[in-house]
């Protein structure tokens, strides 16, 4: 083999290595984009989690302010929610973070005073709309199941507020 053949082979080998490296870089980039696609818009997830975290304190405020007809049943229903939601949201966020990384974009919201059981019912209906709209920000079945459990608690609370006096 002459010197030119060796040089050509060497250049071909370098080109092949560069092309493989570019392909690997593209695959890594595509995998990163796929992970983002699987995750969905994290801002929707962040908002849902922020609302759920806020709901614990908001419902506790409603609980402490209950008064009037049917207030004991409402008081106990609201207590069941704010005591139950903490562990559910904590588990949901930890599961999400184990797969996708830390949630860091939390929002805070103003608190409302207790006005009536009807206002509490309206609050839970609005919260459910947010959960329903934002839950598709994650596709994983185990995260969807955890969101189902949150909605289960929400609807159980709504039942108690509407029908138990």
Residue ranges and their predicted role:
Residues 46-49, 53, 79, 86, ...:
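Short amphipathic alpha-helical segments with heptad-repeat character
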Residues 49, 56-63, 89, 93-96, ...:
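A structural signal for well-ordered alpha-helices, especially hydrophobic packing surfaces
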Residues 108-162:
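Acidic/histidine-rich alpha-helical segments that form the ligand environment
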Residues 1-47:
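Intrinsically disordered, compositionally biased, charge-dense segments
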Residues 72-103:
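Conserved alpha-helical segments that form or flank metal/cofactor-binding pockets of metalloenzymes
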């Amino acid at each position: 083999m002459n010197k030119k053949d060796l040089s050509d082979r060497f250049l071909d080998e370098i080109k092949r290595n560069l092309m493989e490296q570019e392909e690997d870089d593209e695959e890594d980039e595509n995998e990163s984009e796929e992970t983002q696609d699987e995750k969905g818009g994290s801002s929707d997830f962040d908002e849902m989690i922020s609302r759920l975290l806020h709901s614990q304190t908001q419902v506790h405020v409603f609980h402490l302010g209950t008064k009037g007809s049917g207030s004991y049943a409402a008081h106990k229903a609201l207590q069941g929610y704010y005591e139950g939601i903490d562990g559910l949201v904590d588990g949901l966020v930890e599961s999400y973070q184990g797969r996708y990384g830390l949630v860091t974009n939390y929002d805070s919201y103003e608190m409302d005073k207790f006005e009536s059981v009807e206002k509490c019912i309206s609050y839970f209906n609005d919260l459910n709309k947010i959960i329903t709209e934002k839950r598709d920000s994650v596709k994983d079945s185990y995260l969807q199941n955890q969101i189902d459990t949150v909605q289960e608690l929400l609807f159980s609370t709504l039942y108690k507020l509407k029908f138990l006096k």
